[in-house]
C-alpha cells in the first residue's frame, strides 16, 4: 500500500519556505511547537488515528464471509470495498484544501467525527445497503484523518524531530493496511464482524479526546491570506462540481458492474442506463476539471507531464490488481480450502511480509540511484508472473504453493507499487508536489474501486454459469444467498464438490483479471522516463539557468 503524501509534501514545502525565511534558524524559528508529554500524547493520538483509518481499507477482506452469512448478500461483496475506496479517493483533494483554508484542529476533529459516525452506521447496519452507506461515510472521514495526521505532525512538531515523527506515521500506514485482514478475521471469528467497525469507537474516541485536550492549531498553521479568502473562493477551491461528477460517474459504473449478469441482464434498461450515465458524468467531470484549472481535483497542466500521465495509467491498473488480490485471496482460503476468517488472514502473511521488505528496498534504491523505471517494469513483470501462478490455484493446491506464490507476489508489489509516486514527486515543481501526489493517489484508489467491482461481477457470473453446468439441480440463488462459512454446513457430497468447483472457476476469472491488470500496469511503466530523476533534475536546472 502506498502512503497518501499529499499534505505531508505540502507541509514539507512550507517547512522549506519557513527555513529560508528564518535564515536557517532551524528549531529556533519563532514558531510554537509541542514538547514533552504534550508531544508524546499527540504522537500516540495520531498513531491511533492513522492505524484505525488504514485498517478500515482492508479489514472487510476477511470479514466478508461472515457478513454474507448474515445478510445473504454475496452480490454486494464488491460494494463493501469499492464504495470505501471511491469516497477516500474523491475526497482526498478536498480535505487537503479544507486544512489549508480552515482551522486545522477543528477540521481534524470533524474528520474524526465523520469517520466514527460511518463506523457506527456500519456496526449497527440492519441491512447490506445500510452497511454500504456506512462504508461510504467512513471513507470520507478516513481520507480526512489520514491527510490530517501528516498535516498536524508537520505543524506541531519541531523540525529536528519531524522526520522521525512522520516516519512513525508512515510505518503505521504500511503496517495498518497489511494487518487489516488479520484483525478482521480474528474479530469476525471470535466476536462478531460488527466489531470490525465498533472497535474504532473507543479507540478513536480516546484519540480525539487527547487531541482536543493537548493540541491547538499552531499560529504558523494559519496562512492569513488563505483564511481571509472569501467564502466563494473557499468553496471554489473545494471543487465540489468535480467531486460530485466523480462520485456520480463511479456510482453509475459500479451499479452496472454489480447488476450486470447477476441480478439484472446486461441488456436491461437499468444496466444500459447506468452505463450511459457513467460515460456522461465522466465527460462532464473532464469538462469541469478542464474549466476549473488550478482549482481542479485533477489539474490538467500536471496531467500532461509524461511521468504523471503514465504513472496514473499504471497506478490505476496496479491499484486495481492490489485490491482485487487482497479481497479475493481470502475468499479462496475460506470457500475452497474451508479455513476460518482468522486463518485466511494469517495465510496472507507471506504476501504482507514480502511486500514490506521490497517496499523498503525500492525506496532505498530510488533514493540512492535515482532510477525508478527499472523497478516499476521489473516488479510489474514479476507481479504478472506471480499472478499467473496464483491463477493455477485449485482445491488441491499445496501449502508450499500458496505460500510461495503469495510471497513472490508480495516481493513484486513492493518493487513497483510505490515508485511511480516517488518519481512524480521528485520530478514535480515544488509548488506542484502536493497536487501531483494527490492525482496519483486518486487514480490508484479509483483503480481499486472499479476493479474490485469488476472482479465481483466476473466472479458472480462465472459461479452462476459453472454451477448450472456442474449441478443443474442445485438452486443457484440459494447458493449465492448462502454465506461462505455456511457452505459446508448446508451442502454435502457431490453437490458440495460441484459448488466448490464452481467457486474455484469463478475465482479463476477474478485471478485472470489480476494478470491483465498487472500486465497493463507493466506496459504503462515502459513509457515512464528511463533516466535517473537526478539526471533529469540536473538537466532542468541547466535549462533554467540558461
Swiss-Prot record:
Q: Which PROSITE patterns match?
A: MFS (PS50850)
Residues that span the membrane, as ranges: 39-59, 77-96, 107-127, 137-157, 167-187, 195-215, 240-260, 270-290, 307-327, 349-369, 370-390, 402-422, 433-453, 509-529
Q: Which InterPro entries did the record assign?
A: MFS, MFS_dom, MFS_trans_sf
Has UniProt tagged this entry with the keyword Chaperone? no
Protein induction: The expression of the dibenzodioxocinones biosynthesis cluster is positively regulated by the transcription factor dibT.
User: Which keywords are on file for this protein?
Assistant: Cell membrane, Glycoprotein, Membrane, Transmembrane, Transmembrane helix, Transport
Q: Which Pfam families match?
A: MFS_1
Deleted gene: phenotype = Significantly decreases the production of dibenzodioxocinones by approximately 67%.
According to UniProt, this protein's pathway is:
Secondary metabolite biosynthesis
List the GO terms this entry assigns under cellular component, sorted alphabetically.
Answer: plasma membrane
Q: List the disulfide bonds.
A: none
Task: Describe the task this protein carries out.
Answer: MFS-type transporter; part of the gene cluster that mediates the biosynthesis of dibenzodioxocinones such as pestalotiollide B, a novel class of inhibitors against cholesterol ester transfer protein (CEPT). essential for dibenzodioxocinones biosynthesis and may be involved in the secretion of the cluster products.
What is this protein's record name?
MFS-type transporter GME11371
What organism, scientifically named, is this protein from? Answer: Pestalotiopsis microspora
Q: What is the lineage of its organism?
A: Eukaryota, Fungi, Dikarya, Ascomycota, Pezizomycotina
Amino acid at each position: 500500500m502506498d502512503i497518501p503524501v499529499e499534505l505531508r509534501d505540502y507541509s514539507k514545502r512550507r517547512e522549506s519556505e519557513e527555513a529560508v525565511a528564518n535564515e536557517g534558524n532551524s528549531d529556533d524559528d519563532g514558531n510554537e511547537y509541542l514538547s514533552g508529554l504534550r508531544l508524546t500524547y499527540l504522537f500516540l493520538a495520531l498513531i491511533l488515528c492513522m492505524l484505525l483509518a488504514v485498517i478500515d481499507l482492508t479489514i472487510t477482506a476477511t470479514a466478508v464471509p461472515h457478513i454474507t452469512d448474515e445478510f445473504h448478500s454475496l452480490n454486494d461483496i464488491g460494494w463493501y470495498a469499492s464504495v470505501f475506496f471511491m469516497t477516500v479517493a474523491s475526497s482526498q483533494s478536498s480535505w487537503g484544501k479544507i486544512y489549508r483554508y480552515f482551522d486545522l484542529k477543528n477540521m481534524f476533529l470533524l474528520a474524526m467525527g465523520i469517520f466514527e459516525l460511518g463506523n457506527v452506521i456500519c456496526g449497527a447496519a440492519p441491512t447490506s445497503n445500510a452497511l454500504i452507506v456506512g462504508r461510504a461515510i467512513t471513507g470520507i472521514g478516513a481520507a480526512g484523518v489520514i491527510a490530517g495526521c501528516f498535516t498536524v505532525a508537520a505543524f506541531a512538531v519541531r523540525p529536528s524531530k519531524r522526520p522521525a515523527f512522520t516516519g512513525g506515521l508512515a510505518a503505521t500506514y504500511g503496517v495498518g493496511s497489511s494487518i487489516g485482514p488479520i484483525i478482521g478475521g480474528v474479530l469476525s471469528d471470535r466476536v462478531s464482524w460488527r466489531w470490525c467497525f465498533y472497535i474504532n469507537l473507543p479507540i478513536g474516541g480516546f484519540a480525539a479526546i487527547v487531541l482536543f485536550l493537548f493540541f491547538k492549531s499552531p499560529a504558523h498553521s494559519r496562512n492569513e491570506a488563505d483564511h481571509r479568502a472569501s467564502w466563494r473562493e473557499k468553496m471554489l477551491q473545494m471543487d465540489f462540481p468535480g467531486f460530485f461528477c466523480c462520485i456520480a460517474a463511479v456510482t453509475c459504473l459500479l451499479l452496472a458492474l454489480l447488476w450486470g449478469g447477476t441480478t439484472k441482464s446486461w441488456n436491461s434498461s437499468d444496466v444500459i442506463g447506468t452505463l450511459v450515465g457513467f460515460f456522461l458524468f465522466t465527460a462532464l467531470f473532464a469538462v469541469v476539471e478542464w474549466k476549473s484549472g488550478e482549482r481542479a481535483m485533477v489539474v490538467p497542466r500536471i496531467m500532461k507531464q509524461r511521468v504523471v500521465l503514465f504513472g496514473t495509467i499504471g497506478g490505476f491498473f496496479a491499484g486495481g490488481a492490489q485490491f482485487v488480490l487482497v479481497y479475493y485471496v481470502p475468499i479462496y482460503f475460506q470457500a475452497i480450502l474451508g479455513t476460518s476468517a482468522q486463518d485466511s488472514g494469517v495465510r496472507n502473511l507471506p504476501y504482507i511480509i514480502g511486500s514490506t521488505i521490497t517496499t523498503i528496498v525500492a525506496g532505498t534504491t530510488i533514493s540512492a540511484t535515482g532510477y525508478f523505471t527499472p523497478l516499476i517494469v521489473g516488479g510489474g513483470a514479476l507481479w504478472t508472473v506471480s499472478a499467473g501462478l496464483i491463477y493455477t490455484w485449485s482445491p488441491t493446491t499445496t501449502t508450499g504453493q500458496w505460500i510461495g506464490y503469495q510471497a513472490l507476489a508480495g516481493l513484486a508489489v513492493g518493487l513497483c507499487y510505490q515508485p511511480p509516486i516517488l518519481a512524480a514527486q521528485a520530478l514535480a515543481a515544488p509548488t506542484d508536489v502536493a497536487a501531483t501526489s494527490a492525482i496519483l493517489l486518486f487514480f490508484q484508489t479509483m483503480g481499486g474501486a472499479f476493479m474490485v467491482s469488476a472482479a465481483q461481477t466476473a466472479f458472480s457470473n462465472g459461479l452462476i454459469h459453472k454451477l448450472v453446468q456442474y449441478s443443474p439441480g442445485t438452486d443457484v440463488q440459494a447458493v449465492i444467498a448462502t454465506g461462505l462459512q455456511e457452505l459446508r454446513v448446508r451442502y454435502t457430497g457431490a453437490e458440495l464438490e460441484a459448488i466448490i468447483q464452481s467457486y474455484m472457476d469463478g475465482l479463476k476469472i477474478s485471478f485472470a483479471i489480476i494478470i491483465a491488470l498487472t500486465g497493463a500496469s507493466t506496459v504503462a511503466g515502459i513509457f515512464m522516463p528511463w533516466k535517473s530523476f537526478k539526471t533529469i533534475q540536473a538537466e532542468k536546472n541547466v535549462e533554467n539557468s540558461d
